[in-house]
UniProtKB/Swiss-Prot annotation:
<keyword id="KW-0276">Fatty acid metabolism</keyword>
<dbReference type="InterPro" id="IPR002582">
    <property type="entry name" value="ACPS"/>
</dbReference>
<keyword id="KW-0275">Fatty acid biosynthesis</keyword>
<keyword id="KW-0963">Cytoplasm</keyword>
<keyword id="KW-0479">Metal-binding</keyword>
<keyword id="KW-0444">Lipid biosynthesis</keyword>
<keyword id="KW-0808">Transferase</keyword>
<dbReference type="GO" id="GO:0000287">
    <property type="term" value="F:magnesium ion binding"/>
</dbReference>
<feature type="binding site">
    <location>
        <position position="58"/>
    </location>
    <ligand>
        <name>Mg(2+)</name>
    </ligand>
</feature>
<dbReference type="GO" id="GO:0005829">
    <property type="term" value="C:cytosol"/>
</dbReference>
<dbReference type="InterPro" id="IPR050559">
    <property type="entry name" value="P-Pant_transferase_sf"/>
</dbReference>
<comment type="function">
    <text>Transfers the 4'-phosphopantetheine moiety from coenzyme A to a Ser of acyl-carrier-protein.</text>
</comment>
<dbReference type="GO" id="GO:0008897">
    <property type="term" value="F:holo-[acyl-carrier-protein] synthase activity"/>
</dbReference>
<protein>
    <recommendedName>
        <fullName>Holo-[acyl-carrier-protein] synthase</fullName>
        <ecNumber>2.7.8.7</ecNumber>
    </recommendedName>
</protein>
<dbReference type="InterPro" id="IPR004568">
    <property type="entry name" value="Ppantetheine-prot_Trfase_dom"/>
</dbReference>
<dbReference type="GO" id="GO:0019878">
    <property type="term" value="P:lysine biosynthetic process via aminoadipic acid"/>
</dbReference>
<dbReference type="InterPro" id="IPR037143">
    <property type="entry name" value="4-PPantetheinyl_Trfase_dom_sf"/>
</dbReference>
Length: 120
């Protein structure tokens, strides 16, 4: 049974500017494991990865019903690419199944997260 759906669209350039302007931005958004994956990329691909994680976590927070804030932070959610590049939610406060999807254009990243209960 679907418990929540969240979508987000983020401008990649906006995330790039935030990362450039604020030295701790990347560490604020990414968990240590996500930072490991991030470090494997360079140039535009690293910016796309960061924008994708920002957007995925925003989508998760919307599906969860809280938004990012006092009750849910960026480090409460971890999303790692599997061997095929698909995003997998590996850490979250949600006890059911979490399904994530991400897509990029040259300027935008769009994400969706669906939270599903384990009981059907």
């Amino acid at each position: 049974m679907i418990k929540g759906i969240g979508i987000d669209i983020t401008e990649i350039e906006r995330v790039k500017k935030a990362a450039t302007a604020h030295s701790q931005f990347i560490q604020h958004v990414l968990t240590p494991t996500e930072l490991e994956q991030y470090s494997q990329f360079s140039g535009q691909r690293s910016v796309e990865y960061l924008a994708g994680r920002w957007s995925l976590k925003e989508s998760f927070a919307k599906a969860y019903g809280t938004g990012i804030g006092a009750n849910l932070g960026f480090h409460d959610i971890e999303i790692i690419d599997n061997q095929y590049g698909a995003p997998i939610v590996t850490k979250s406060p949600y006890n059911g199944n979490a399904h994530a999807s991400v897509s990029h254009t040259a300027t935008l990243v769009m994400t969706e997260v669906i939270l599903e209960s384990e009981n059907k």
